[in-house]
């Protein structure tokens, strides 16, 4: 089990329903906001296995977003859309829940169906979207950090 640092500024919650994948996690966050009477209009999602994604990329992403132009924004680099690096309007909650009930599980397919805007980010090495999925990836990340 993972031991999390306790903080009054961080809330942890279990997915409201298991087996729904990343979209279920997004919906869980939206439901938590509603249930806890938060006045948030947006949530951000970022994978936790991308050690080279920095505040610089995050700041650029937020600066380029025009929230009156959409309800869902993802980051794009080169020709790749990064479907977990996102900003999601809480207004998508009912549609997301309906589509999950109908069996949709793929973030890319769902985002395409409702309409998604992208913000292109150019970057220098190391690749901020490099993610660690295997022991080999971890070794590579350690080497990148040593050489950076």
Enumerate the language-model features and the residues they cover.
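Nucleotide and nucleotide-moiety/phosphate-recognizing core
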Residues: 1-104, 112-129, 135-136, 140-146
